[in-house]
Amino acid sequence: MAIPSYKVRLETNEPITPNVRKLVFRLEDPKTITYKQGQFVSFMLGTEDGRPIKRSYSIANMETDGVDSTYIEFVISYVEGGKASELFFNAEPGKEMEMTGPFGLLCLTEELPKRVFLVGTGTGVAPYRSMIEQMRTRTDTEFHILFGAQYLEDMFYLDDFKAVALLDHVHFHPCLSREEKPGCFSGYVQHKLAELNPNPETDIAYLCGNPNMVDEVFEMLKDKDFGVKQVKREKYVFSRF
Ligand SMILES: Cc1cc2nc3c(=O)[nH]c(=O)nc-3n(C[C@H](O)[C@H](O)[C@H](O)COP(=O)(O)OP(=O)(O)OC[C@H]3O[C@@H](n4cnc5c(N)ncnc54)[C@H](O)[C@@H]3O)c2cc1C
């Protein structure tokens, strides 16, 4: 089956941390997209040397469902010298682009165990922001959102995560590796996760973002007897083209 492709138009492009911008695109043709919370899309981008490049970005929309959505929101971090980074960071509202998708399996399953750990570093929390409305209604499961960053100023969507964490069954753990701040864990997400005593009998984990973090946490969970199916992973690997 052909992969759906969409023409989208950039609506807003604003900095939300010193290194991350939030971009909102309006669907132009077709006018809507249906996706599952946790999925990503891929952009085909033109470059100066004429060779198109493909880059993927997680859908960060916070909606009750992903049916017939008319817009797509992304959070994109700047990579020094990165082709897509330059393009997105300098894109003006009104710019048209092509994207395909949605792709990916980092989605909440029908059946969930007692506890779900949602672990992300940097823009790797985008899929979890998209899952917020689902978390609200799935009251039989305890959710732990672990957001890792170096400094507090590198974090975003904090109001959304804190708001959902007002519910008894949702817990938000901001983790800072380079500074101490009230209300934040000092250290890496790995260390916070270890403190929560993950148990393969009762828990599953979702890992997203920096490939090294994903590998490290996966190894830690395997040492605690988690099976491959109990750890869902999305690595933000760099593209070779
Ligand atoms: C499934 C998936 C979902 C993704 N979702 C997001 C998302 O929601 N938000 C987001 O910001 N990114 C996301 N990414 C990463 C994104 O697709 C690009 O890889 C990223 O934007 C860098 O592209 P670029 O063209 O700017 O850099 P490139 O031109 O690809 O790279 C430039 C140079 O920087 C190096 N490099 C590339 N990325 C990094 C990095 N992160 N850290 C250090 N060095 C790097 C490369 O090796 C290269 O030397 C995702 C990736 C995948 C696979």
Model-identified regions with their sequence ranges:
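Histidine-anchored nucleotide/phosphate-binding helix
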Residues: 127-136
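Reductase modules of NAD(P)H-dependent flavoproteins
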Residues: 2-7, 142, 146-241
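Conserved beta-strand elements of the Class I
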Residues: 117-119, 206
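Ferredoxin-reductase
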Residues: 2-93
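Conserved S-adenosyl-L-methionine
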Residues: 113, 136-143
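Ser/Thr-glycine-rich phosphate-binding loops at phosphate-binding pockets of nucleotides
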Residues: 121-125
